[in-house]
Amino acid sequence: INAVVEVHTPSITNLDDHNEQEPREECGVYGVWAPGEEVSKLTYFGLFALQHRGQEAAGIAVGDDDRIVVFKDMGLVANIFDESTLSALQGNVAVGHTRYSTAGGKEWSNVQPMFSTSSTGVDIALGHNGNLVNYLELREEAVQRGLIKPHEESVSDSMCLSMLLADGVDEDTSVFDSARD
């Protein structure tokens, strides 16, 4: 499986000068790699614990050697996932995400994890916390590669990154090499 998770945790230097002692809300990201375990349930409980970081939406991507399955929706973690849904999310690796919008609208298309497939069939699930400071440059690169239309406004920074990573993967280039490029 080729899954990439980028995690950013804000530090005190990222806080507004006026509120240095107060935490800022940002998303929560939780990852699990545990062969032989029910990673969807472990991820669910991790997201439940992180839910204070984002109560707008949540999602879990679970994978094995053959595929990645993503389930995500708007709402609280406990309202999105039930026993039936978690049982259907089978695999040995997972990434979960709770959303608090800082960029992009409060709409389903911005709920993470993001999912993209490379031209060679490699699936990528990405959970991202924070804002990409070079989003406009990445977006322009995605437009130049034909991944998004020039005037398409609904592409979040995380979806843009996911599409660029997938686009860079081929027989000779791994997801990790694509991220370095």
Model-derived features with residue positions:
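Conserved short alpha-helical segments that host acidic/polar catalytic motifs at enzyme active sites
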Residues: N2-D181
